[in-house]
Amino acid sequence: MKFCIEIEGAAVGGIGVHPGEDVHRHTATVGYWLGEEFWGRGIMTEAVTVVTDFCFENFPLRRISAEVFANNPASARVLEKAGFPFEGCLKNDVLKDGKLLDSLLYARTT
């Protein structure tokens, strides 16, 4: 399920929830992006909160998780403010622009 974040008729970001399968069917992951000029306004914190609340209320989910690059503390703060506790660090998890980066794992449960 994917949602557009719209401000004054313009798409400025997006958020998506991707359900797990089989033994993970009670879980989902959330991912998001927001145009840089809209950073620091609480827009994404509100979007993550509203979308995860909606998912917990309307689907048989018990856990929604998200991963952020370790070098993106603003995105980690979005998750923390939306009620996602930090669960751990995934070392050398992603290869971005030729560099290995750690990912930080956050999750909200019912």
Region locations from a protein language model:
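Acyl-donor (CoA/ACP) binding surface of acyl/acetyltransferases
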Residues: K2-T110
